Amino acid sequence: MLHFVANMKRAVALWPFTSHRHFTEEESKRHIPFQRVAAAACGAGILSSLAYAPDQILMTLTGGGVFSLSHSVGVAVCVALVFTLVVMSYRHSMYAYPRGGEYEVTYTNIGPSWGILVAAAVIIDCVLTVSVSVASAAQYFVSLFPFLAGKHVYVACAMLCVLAAIHARQRHRMRALWAIPTYFFVTIIVILLITGCIQLLTASGEGVFVAVPPQIHEAPVSVGLAGYILLLRAFSLGCTVMTGAETFSYDVYRFPRPQSVRAARSLSKIAACAGLLLIALVCVSQYGDRLISPLTVESSGTYPLSEAVSQKARIPVIMQVAHRVFGPQTLGTFIVVIATISILFLAARMVFHTVTSQVSVLALQGCMPIYWHHRYSRFSGAYAWMLLICVAGVVVVMTQANLATLIHLYAVAAFIILTVSQLAMIRYWNTQLRERQTGGARKQTLRSRSLNIVGFILTSIVFVVILATEFIQGAWVTLAMVVFLYAIYAAYRHYHTKLEYEVNVNQWDEACRVPNRVRAVVLISKWDKPHMRALAVARASGAVTVEAVALAVSATAEDLVREQWRELGLPVPLTILYTSKRDMVALLSDHIRLVREQYPHEVLSVYFPQVIGKYWWESILHRRITRALRLAVMDIPDTVLTLVPWKRAN
């Protein structure tokens, strides 16, 4: 059976390969990628949000008419400015804790409870990142191939399987390929925007882009509180562009030395690039297409606005712009879609490393079982990301791969992480200020603390805005999942702490006392080689007494057992238990308890054989009495279970 399980594991992970964590220092240097490669890989999470963040801003503002839609660029600029300030303050955590991530920052400075909360939010954020990425990729794929309309769930699940296959067979030599999707996506989007702007500026008459449809002109020009709430909702949905920033804190080790400096610079460059591209996409969409293009709505206004929006919402903004610039079903549009899907794939795949690292740290800190720590098994990391794939698949199926529904769940966990980590860094700088520092160092510390205070205020405001505007739409689900996972981690940590206290060895602990004597009991169900081998091992163990215990179902069977025992002539006392219509496991465990009560200061060693077959399927053919008896005897104190294997001959 063990060989069958091992073969099943190998079917998933295929051939083994060396982990870079076990290399020497010189060998590890050769496996660290260039800064451009590491920055592109880590920045995929931020840049991939450009595939759906502009859609959410424009789709939200379309419901408010001209007044709201005219502020789309302002909303994008606000998102970019807030993102810039948050990144400026977030960089300090990479300098202070280059290998810890948000969990270690919070765990060290605020306490274990807050650290567990951040860890739960990180896991939920990773699940939602994979779900949103594959749902968005499926939306682009279905938009490119219309015959797959209505099959979003199947396409997203197929993409999850492809992601699992790619991640299972990654190689260190393939790390240079990580940069290709990021640079390819940025290059294609820049070309798309430049071409669109040139066509928009040089167009005359009808032009390449169309103006606002007549239905939107009929919307009220001035709105009250509802319009401003709509702007806040658009801002909160646009803040999904910030959700990939926490990836850098977990992947600082991927950068060449000095790792913290290079990681912080790369984060700043990626954030600036994402902010500029977000503003540019929203500008082109607002002044060009207004989200509703002639591809689905005629300029004469034959469709009502709600129906037009529902039809056009299925086509992402980037693809709409590509349709207007390059034309539908052209090579340019195909390249744009492929570039977008590739960056979404890379963003989802990079999350696997974050989950594996976070789960490993949690296991090491006593918040999860220790076998989840990757250093103890090369399959423990595979368990983490395979579970991530399964949970993400469940989320995709439950939401029907609806990107709008997933976006409402998405940003909550990310801003829990950002807000709590900013608070932890404020505590960190307060601790540094209590120490004696020179004038220059103290000024630098005060400046860093001020930036983190600004970052904490901004992330708190954004978090409150997200909760206020998206709570009913689904933010409460994310909060519930984070609280549920936090409760599991906290409960296991409490159990682990109590267990460590109970098993802790003191100098005069009772567990250190040497028992007076050891008694052996051999369970015999029939006279064969496995049972005789178990009896021989028990006699050779040096026990003060060895007792053979056999079972008989009738008086005739009891006489036969005694006759066979006399023929063997072994100098071992025999005890026969009568088991007519009674559970033999319960009868044997009762006898062992009776022997244990008669000799309370001695250790009782129970021997029983087990036949080991040559093939995995042979274990199915044998009785399960050995396992049931082992479970029953384990509850008896000061009782040692000894399994004597008997392997079949080849």
Model-derived regions, located:
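Membrane-interface "cap" regions at the ends of multi-pass membrane proteins
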Residues: 2-59, 95, 106-109, 113, ...
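Cytosolic C-terminal regulatory domains/tails of membrane transporters and channels
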Residues: 1-28, 497-650
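C-terminal membrane-solvent junction of multi-pass transporters and transport-like membrane proteins
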Residues: 371-383, 418-471, 509-511
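Hydrophobic alpha-helical segments and their helix-loop junctions in multi-pass secondary transporters
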Residues: 185-216, 282-290, 419-436, 491-500
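Loop-to-transmembrane helix boundary motifs in multi-pass membrane proteins
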Residues: 112, 152-158, 254-277, 360-397, ...
